[in-house]
Amino acid sequence: MTTVTPSAGRELSNPPSDGISNLRFSNNSDHLLVSSWDKRVRLYDVSTNSLKGEFLHGGAVLDCCFHDDFSGFSVGADYKVRRIVFNVGKEDILGTHDKAVRCVEYSYAAGQVITGSWDKTVKCWDPRGASGPERTQVGTYLQPERVYSMSLVGHRLVVATAGRHVNIYDLRNMSQPEQRRESSLKYQTRCVRCYPNGTGYALSSVEGRVAMEFFDLSEAAQAKKYAFKCHRKSEAGRDIVYPVNSIAFHPIYGTFATGGCDGFVNIWDGNNKKRLYQYSKYPTSISALSFSRDGQLLAVASSYTFEEGEKSQEPEAIFVRSVNEIEVKPKPKVYPNPAA
């Protein structure tokens, strides 16, 4: 494991003025979509460090995702699911939930928007229909508890809820979950992200741990699952444990970054169970992470997540760092030479 202290990365100008709930790179460019508790969704062009546009909503914006380079979807505390188009400054409401909407994903495979809410439902929407739920809503799927995090890979959807429940769906048949699971971690789930190769997912908790899980229920596949501790420190003989807020997979190598309330970003090689890198400490909690489509940039949201209640805090900031291959490329396993 290598620890160095490179710069935090380039800081974007015009950052949000309140907590950053998520940020995501486009699949086609260096555009970055950012949702925030200041009721705004912002689109940045990272290559020119410029704000391309923003929308003001009726409440805190809790998540956002891209549709294409200049449009996407946003959800939040005002219960609404919106399509937002930046190059023409237009938004429409696809529909609503009964409580705050925590998560949104767009499935390119299914052509649907998927939302997860604190009303204990997941809803699917067809954005090609005209505005309004009667024309765009595809289905509503009851969950055991409030939805905290979701992730997609291909036709698979993983939904993590309060109460440590995990439901795994096939988007082609949403009537029942393919699998109903319980988190293998003892404490509340903070983030779930699918492996880019589609074989499973990583799940993080408020108690400084990440679990590596596999979809295949065979004994051989399940024997590969494990969990590890991270984002902790020892102080005066006590272990101080921090929530792991964010997980982001590298699109080329399948290694992944975690961001915690300790202000650190770590890079992990999940297959070899090793930490590859730790970046120097950021000003405050890491609330969100995203790799660019080619894996050469990592966007880091440094934004206090109120794990210690009200206190004086560093201002919200978005850093974009260049990623060196040595930080994210798995190291080959070294086998001892057989005795002569």
UniProtKB/Swiss-Prot annotation:
InterPro entries: G-protein_beta_WD-40_rep (IPR020472), WD40/YVTN_repeat-like_dom_sf (IPR015943), WD40_repeat_dom_sf (IPR036322), WD40_rpt (IPR001680). It comes from the Eukaryota. Disruption phenotype: Survives only in heterozygous state. Displays defects in development of male and female gametophytes. Keywords: Cell cycle, Cell division, Centromere, Chromosome, Chromosome partition, Cytoplasm, Cytoskeleton, Kinetochore, Meiosis, Mitosis, Nucleus, Repeat, WD repeat. It is found in: Nucleus; Chromosome, Centromere, Kinetochore; Cytoplasm, Cytoskeleton, Phragmoplast; Cytoplasm, Cytoskeleton, Spindle. Pfam families: WD40. GO terms for biological process: cell division; chromosome segregation; meiotic cell cycle; mitotic spindle assembly checkpoint signaling. The keyword Cytoplasm applies. The keyword Nucleus applies. Expressed in actively dividing tissues, early in organ development, in young leaves, lateral root primordia and root meristems, flower buds, flowers and siliques. GO terms for cellular component: Cul4-RING E3 ubiquitin ligase complex; kinetochore; kinetochore microtubule; nucleus; phragmoplast; spindle microtubule. Induction: Cell cycle regulated expression with a distinct expression peak at the G2/M boundary. Residues 1-20 are annotated as: Disordered. Belongs to the WD repeat BUB3 family. This is Mitotic checkpoint protein BUB3.1. It comes from Arabidopsis thaliana. The lineage of its organism: Eukaryota, Viridiplantae, Streptophyta, Embryophyta, Tracheophyta.
